[in-house]
Regions:
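Active-site environment of divalent metal-dependent phosphoester hydrolases
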Residues: 73-75, 106-111, 132-142, 193-196, ...
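His/acidic metal-ligating clusters that form di-metal
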Residues: 93-96, 184-186, 202-304
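Extended active-site neighborhood of metal-dependent phosphoesterases/phosphodiesterases
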Residues: 33-53, 116-231, 334-337
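Divalent metal-coordination and catalytic microenvironments
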Residues: 69, 86, 98, 103, ...
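Binuclear metal-dependent phosphoesterase catalytic core
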Residues: 28-36, 40, 47-53, 172-178, ...
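Active-site-proximal beta-strand elements of phosphoester/diester hydrolases
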Residues: 61-74, 182-192, 239, 316-322
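N-terminal Sec-pathway targeting helices
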Residues: 1-19
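N-terminal active-site segment of His-dependent metallophosphoesterases
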Residues: 29-116
Length: 353
């Protein structure tokens, strides 16, 4: 064989390898999508108590283990340690429900991560209810595809929610005591990042988004719908990935000993290690919560090192203890207990044995 032919063969083999690797990379990197099933919310007339997800209260107390920011399959953090910590918390608390507070998985391979995360959650054998954080949006991931994969779980309680309002996965779970609603959980998508540009298309800055006006209207319709159905205001707990701006106001009022006009604030527990990274933009969610008088507790994550709980004008605003990004002895969650008289208590629970 001449040198020229040998060289041509080497080049051909090299090109075949490059083509093969390119196909593999395309398969791995290409985001997965699915058809969106249209479900339009048309105001209070769309409220249907029968369509709301439910879970039965089977003992005096109803306990929720809230975990957050697992960012499953992130190569920089140990899945084994996180899984062990969650299992330890389940063994300690015997929860009726696990709520995952967003950033459940992260990165360019979210379409694979969601499957591994869902498999892990199913292995615990406990009903679980997820919300989305900002990292589920990574690399333009299709949240409807991610939702479809999670809904293959045997133990999940989840609803994609209306498709004509902001966010994906805005839904309620009614905790049932016989035929009546004992308590209700409101789970909402606080969306991802917002980017601002100048007139020439240059990015000026970005900030984390929050619960938007269309979602607030949906929230109001559901709170009013629950009240009409039950003949009373139904007590609710809100879960979202990021805090409301009022948390920041309360924190600095307490830290700097500067009272807020017409507002009472109180420190409950925990530490603020990093600045509030959640929503700084005022969409009006707190005002609507205060007006309707149903939601007295809000739990959120996002800022990995914080576990502070404050009270702002009668509403507890509480960071869920981080589950995926801390050192082993700081991996944990937040245990929420609703007793038979509907009194709510919450505390940090650690994942070490």
């Amino acid at each position: 064989m001449s040198k020229m032919k040998r060289w041509q063969k080497v080049v051909a083999v090299f090109l075949v390898i490059v083509l093969f690797l390119g196909i593999v990379a395309l398969y791995l990197l290409c985001p997965r999508t699915t058809a969106k099933e249209v479900d339009n919310w048309l105001g209070e007339e769309s409220f249907d108590i029968q369509s709301i997800k439910t879970i039965d209260k089977t003992k005096d107390d109803f306990t929720i283990l809230a975990i957050t920011d697992i960012q499953f399959d992130n190569p920089f953090y140990s899945k084994k340690d996180v899984k062990t910590a969650i299992k330890n918390m389940i063994d300690k608390t015997n929860p009726d429900l696990i709520v995952t507070g967003g950033d459940n998985f992260a990165g360019i391979f979210n379409h694979f991560h969601v499957k591994a995360f869902t498999k892990m959650m199913d292995e615990f054998g406990v009903p679980w209810a997820p919300i989305f954080g900002n990292h589920e949006y990574d690399f333009h991931s299709d949240l409807y595809y991610l939702s479809k994969q999670m809904m293959k779980s045997e133990n999940i309680i989840f609803d994609v929610g209306p498709t004509n309002i902001d966010g994906v996965g805005n839904y309620l779970i009614n905790i049932m005591d016989g035929d009546s609603i004992f308590y209700s959980l409101v789970l909402m998508d606080s969306n991802a990042e917002v980017f601002r540009y100048d007139g020439r298309g240059n990015r000026l800055y970005s900030y984390y988004d929050g619960i938007r006006p269309s979602q607030i209207e949906w929230y109001e319709d559901n709170i009013n719908g629950l009240a009409k159905s039950e003949g009373r205001t139904v007590d609710t707990i809100l879960f979202s990935h990021t805090a409301l701006p009022q948390f920041n106001d309360a924190y600095y009022a307490i830290k700097n000993n500067t009272p807020l006009d017409g507002v009472s604030v109180k420190y409950n527990y925990g530490n603020m290690v990093e600045e509030l990274g959640g929503c700084r933009y005022e969409y009006g969610m707190y005002e609507k919560m205060a007006e309707l008088g149903s939601t007295k507790y809000h739990f959120f994550g996002h800022d990995h090192s914080n576990n502070t709980s404050l009270n702002y004008n009668g509403i507890d605003m509480t960071y869920i203890q981080n589950t995926g990004h801390n050192k082993d002895d700081q991996i944990g969650g937040t245990l929420i207990k609703i007793d038979s008289d509907k009194n709510v208590s919450h505390e940090i629970i650690m994942g070490n044995s």
